[in-house]
A protein has these predicted regions:
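A C-terminal cap/extension of S-adenosyl-L-methionine-dependent methyltransferases
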Residues: 145, 190-243
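Short alpha-helix
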Residues: 167-182
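Helix-to-beta-strand junctions that scaffold the AdoMet/dcAdoMet cofactor pocket
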Residues: 122-123, 138-140
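Short, glycine-/aromatic-enriched active-site segment of Class I SAM-dependent methyltransferases
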Residues: 146-168
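Conserved N-terminal segment of class I S-adenosyl-L-methionine
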Residues: 1-108, 112-116, 126-132, 190-194, ...
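Conserved helix-to-beta-strand junction in the class I
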Residues: 133-139, 182
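Active-site micro-motifs of SAM-dependent methyltransferase domains
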Residues: 100, 120, 153
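A short hydrophobic/small-residue beta-strand
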Residues: 72, 144-145
Length: 243
C-alpha cells in the first residue's frame, strides 16, 4: 500500500490549498505579530542558542527568528515543494524526514525545539516515540514550543479535518499527559487568541474576551454544570514544554 503521506507531502504546497509561500518575504507580514510574540515571550535572550524547528514549511518562522538575531537556527521539512519555496526565498531550510533527523541528533544538543502545526500529523504511537526523541535531544532546562488543533474548541474541527494529513487534535490535558509521560517537568498551554497590533485586531481581541468566549463558557456550564477555570476555546492553542 502506498504511503499517502509521501504522496501528499511531495507536493504539499501545491495540493494543500492553503499556506502557499508568498512571492517575497514581504508576504510573511500577516504572520509577523504571531511569530514576534512567540520570540518576545518564550525565546531565551541568548542569541547563540541552538534552535531546531521541525516541520518548518517554507520557513516563515525561521525568517523572523533570524531577523531577531538568533544565529544558530536550523529548519527541517519533509516536503520537497515547501523546501523549494524556502530556497527561492533564500531561507536556509533543509529537506529531511523529521523523525529520522531527530534520531540522528546528539543527546542534549538543542536549546529550543519548535513544532508549529506539526504534531497533529502523527498517529499516537508515532507521536509518543517522537516526543521521547524530543526529550533526548533537548538540553537540560531546554524548551519546546508547539502549536496544535484544539479538540475542546467549538471551532476545532475546522482545523482537525481541514487537512487530510491531520491524524489528531489535542486538549491542554492531553498535551500534559503526552509530554509528562516522556519525562518533561513542565507543560503549560495557552490560547491562540487575537494579538492586538492595530484597531481591527484590538476589536477582535475585545470581542473574543468579552463576548464570544463568555457565551461558549456559559453554554458549557449549562450542559455540564461547570467549566474548567483554565479551559481553552480558541481553535488552535500553544503549549510551552520545559525539560
Amino acid at each position: 500500500m502506498k504511503n499517502y503521506r509521501a504522496k501528499i507531502y511531495k507536493y504539499y504546497s501545491n495540493v494543500s490549498g492553503k499556506d502557499l509561500a508568498p512571492q517575497t518575504v514581504e508576504g510573511f507580514k500577516p504572520r509577523e505579530p504571531f511569530y514576534n510574540k512567540l520570540i518576545k515571550e518564550y525565546f531565551p535572550q541568548n542569541k547563540e542558542i541552538k534552535i531546531l524547528e521541525i516541520g518548518c514549511g517554507y520557513g516563515a518562522f525561521g525568517y523572523f527568528i533570524q531577523q531577531a538575531g538568533y544565529k544558530n537556527y536550523i529548519g527541517i521539512d519533509g516536503s520537497e515543494s515547501q523546501v523549494h519555496e524556502a530556497k527561492r526565498l533564500k531561507i536556509n531550510i533543509q529537506l529531511a524526514n523529521l523523525v529520522e533527523y531527530l534520531k540522528s541528533i546528539d543527546d542534549e544538543s538543542i536549546d529550543l525545539l519548535i513544532a508549529i502545526d506539526v504534531i497533529e500529523h502523527f498517529t499516537k504511537e508515532e507521536l509518543s516515540d517522537l516526543v521521547d526523541d524530543m526529550y533526548r535531544v533537548l538540553k537540560k532546562d531546554g524548551k519546546i514550543i508547539t502549536h496544535q488543533p484544539n479538540a475542546t474548541s467549538p471551532f476545532g474541527n475546522s482545523i482537525r479535518y481541514g487537512d487530510f494529513t491531520h491524524e489528531l487534535a489535542f486538549t491542554h490535558s492531553s498535551m500534559s499527559q503526552l509530554f509528562l509521560l516522556s519525562g518533561f517537568n513542565s507543560v503549560k498551554s495557552y490560547e491562540d487568541k487575537p494579538i492586538p497590533h492595530g484597531l481591527k485586531s484590538t476589536i477582535r481581541l475585545f470581542l473574543w474576551e468579552y463576548l464570544v468566549k463568555p457565551i461558549y463558557k456559559f453554554a458549557l456550564m449549562i450542559e455540564s454544570g461547570g467549566v474548567e477555570k483554565d479551559i481553552i476555546l480558541t481553535k488552535n492553542f500553544l503549549t510551552i514544554i520545559k525539560k
